[in-house]
Regions:
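RNA-interacting cores
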Residues: 1-203
Length: 203
C-alpha cells in the first residue's frame, strides 16, 4: 500500500504493564498487527522502540512514563481510539493500552534514530547505503553514525546502527521523518525523531 507521507503523525499511548523481554520488537509488532491488520501493508507506518529500564535476566521494565508511539496516518484515528483498554500479549507479558493522543511531526534541525537496519556489520558500507537513500530524498545536513547494536528478527541477529543528522532545514527534517531510512519500520528501525544533542549517538 502506498503511504500518504504528508498525513503521518505520532500516535501516543500510555501503557500499563510490568515488564517485557529485552528483545521484544518482533513480538510487539505481531501483537499490534493482530489489532491493526493494516499495519502490515502500510508502507508509512512504524512502531517506535519502547523506552524501558534494564531488569533482571532477560527482562526490561516499564516505567510510569513509558509510552507506545506509532507513526501512522492521522486518518486512522478512529481505529486507534478503539485500542483504548486493549491488552496486548507480548511474548506472554501483558501490555494494556490507554487513550491515544496524536502529536504532529516537528521540523527540528537535528534528528536521531535509535536504530537503522543494516545489511551487514560494516559501518562504512552502511553509511554508503544511507547516503544513497538520503541523496534520493534530497536531504542534506551532517550525518553521524552511532552505536552498532543487534536486533532479533525471525530467530536471527540483525545489525542496526543508531544515526543522527543535524543542520537540516524544516522541509528536509519533515521529509526524513515521513520517509525514514532503510527497512523494518515495524521493528522500530529507520524512524527519526527530533533531538537536542549530537552526543546521544554515542550512548
Amino acid at each position: 500500500m502506498t503511504a500518504n507521507h504528508d498525513a503521518l503523525v505520532e500516535a501516543v499511548f500510555p501503557l500499563e504493564g510490568k515488564a517485557l523481554p529485552r528483545d521484544h520488537a518482533q513480538a510487539l509488532q505481531h501483537a499490534l498487527a493482530e489489532q491493526l491488520p493494516w499495519l502490515r501493508s502500510d508502507a508509512g507506518a512504524g512502531i517506535h522502540p519502547l523506552k524501558l529500564v534494564s531488569g533482571p535476566e532477560s527482562l526490561a521494565l516499564l516505567s510510569q512514563r513509558t509510552r507506545l508511539i506509532l507513526r501512522v496516518d492521522a486518518n486512522r484515528l478512529d481505529e486507534l481510539k478503539a485500542l483504548c483498554g486493549v491488552e496486548l500479549d507480548v511474548s506472554g507479558h501483558a501490555l494494556r493500552l490507554g487513550a491515544v493522543h496524536l502529536r504532529a511531526l516537528q521540523p527540528l534541525a537535528t534528528l536521531y534514530a535509535y536504530r537503522v537496519a543494516a545489511v551487514g556489520a560494516d559501518e562504512s558500507e552502511f553509511m554508503q547505503a544511507m547516503e544513497a537513500e538520503l541523496t534520493e530524498l534530497a536531504i542534506a545536513g551532517e550525518r553521524v553514525c552511532g552505536k552498532r547494536q543487534s536486533l532479533r528478527r525471525d530467530g536471527l541477529d540483525m545489525t542496526t546502527f543508531s544515526m543522527m543528522l543535524h543542520g537540516l532545514v524544516p522541509e528536509q527534517s519533515l521529509r526524513l521523518q515521513q520517509h525514514g531510512l532503510g527497512p523494518h519500520r515495524l521493528l522500530g528501525c529507520g524512524l527519526f525523531v527530533p533531538h537536542k544533542s549530537a552526543a546521544a549517538v554515542g550512548v
